[in-house]
Amino acid sequence: MQQFEWWHAAFLFLAVVLDILANILLKLSNGFRRPWMGILSLIAVLGAFSALAQAVKGIELSIAYALWGAFGIIATVAAGWIMFNQRLNYKGWGGIALLLLGMVMIKMA
């Protein structure tokens, strides 16, 4: 593994953004009834994995994957709230809290 450089973090950020975009496009595809939205979603997922592949060249896989997944989930929840008026119940908020705690624990390990 190469030494960490800021461009590794930039690729991780890009992977998160593309993951969020893919989830939003998937929702907008309405179960692939709008095929172009679905196809764009698949392209965004491929882009997210490609960016993650570049990020793990300088960030440990366990750290990069945990951050990618956690930030992707949290931002997708926020996007669902803002764009689609979706709300979490107390169990959902508890899950988000555990997710954040898990990110801290992995970073401390």
Curated annotation (Swiss-Prot):
Nucleus as UniProt keyword: no
Quaternary context: Forms a complex with MdtJ.
Functional note: Catalyzes the excretion of spermidine.
UniProt cross-references to Pfam families, sorted A to Z: Multi_Drug_Res (PF00893)
Organism of origin: Photorhabdus laumondii subsp. laumondii (strain DSM 15139 / CIP 105565 / TT01)
An individual GO BP term: glycine betaine transport
Membrane protein topology class: Multi-pass membrane protein
Official protein name in the record: Spermidine export protein MdtI
